[in-house]
């Protein structure tokens, strides 16, 4: 399954992606944190691919709240409402395999769980490589950052009025920090921010944006 996915654009630098992966406590991110695809290996990659081809469809888990990678088009309904660069990649994989694509929307933490348990075949949801994930999942090569070092490609979101007072992690000692639960950014908070007033986990990035916008997070 992973080989089939890799042949359909996962390693191309022009394909869009982002990164919000699941991490475990104490895990250290490697230099490769570019976005990619993860595939279930609970029944073996070759067996899983054969199952997909025999049944005629592939089930892909995603959290559709991370534009421009995956989001909902309010002018459409049903599965056609799901759009974004990762969704287009999912469709391309389906076309390459000659099977129907069935997107399975869910919250982010459930995306990874659905792969480790073998519930769904593939996850495309702005994911990144971590050593712990590589132990239980098949991962594609990153396809978002290209030649850019992914470790230098991340930043923090602050309100416009706070731009002059928050310029680095060292300025967050008396601030409320927000990150998505189970994300690589959550790991960065734990590993790289020396001090902060409070840390809030959110289930989606949209919730995080809203907290910063309304002053509930900095």
Predicted regions and their residues:
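Sec-dependent N-terminal signal peptides
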Residues: 1-3
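C-terminal motif of bacterial Sec signal peptides marking the signal peptidase cleavage site
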Residues: 6-9
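Bacterial signal peptide processing site
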Residues: 11-14
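Ser/Thr-rich, Proline-interspersed low-complexity disordered segments
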Residues: 18-24, 28-32
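Extracytoplasmic small-molecule ligand-binding "clamshell" domains
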Residues: 26, 34, 38-127
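Bilobed "Venus flytrap"/periplasmic-binding protein-like clamshell domains
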Residues: 59, 64-67, 79-95, 127, ...
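Acidic, polar ligand-binding/catalytic clefts
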Residues: 95, 100-171
């Amino acid at each position: 399954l992973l080989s089939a996915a890799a042949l359909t654009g996962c390693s191309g630098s022009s394909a869009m992606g982002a990164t919000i992966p699941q991490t475990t406590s104490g895990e250290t991110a490697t230099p490769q944190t570019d976005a990619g695809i993860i595939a279930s290996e609970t029944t073996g990659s070759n067996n899983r691919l054969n199952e997909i081809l025999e049944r005629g469809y592939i089930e892909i888990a995603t959290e559709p709240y991370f534009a421009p990678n995956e989001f909902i088009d309010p002018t459409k309904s049903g599965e056609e409402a799901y759009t974004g660069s990762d969704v287009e990649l999912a469709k391309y994989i389906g076309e390459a395999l000659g099977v129907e694509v069935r997107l399975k929307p869910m919250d982010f933490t459930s995306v990874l769980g659905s792969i480790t348990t073998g519930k769904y075949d593939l996850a495309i949801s702005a994911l990144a490589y971590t050593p712990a994930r590589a132990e239980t999942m098949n991962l594609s090569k990153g396809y978002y950052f290209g030649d850019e070092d992914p470790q230098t490609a991340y930043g923090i979101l602050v309100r416009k009025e706070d731009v002059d007072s928050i310029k680095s992690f060292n300025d967050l000692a008396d601030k409320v920090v927000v990150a998505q639960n189970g994300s690589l950014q959550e790991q960065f908070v734990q590993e790289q921010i020396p001090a902060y007033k409070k840390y809030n986990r959110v289930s989606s990035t949209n919730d995080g944006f809203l907290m910063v916008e309304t002053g509930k997070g900095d």
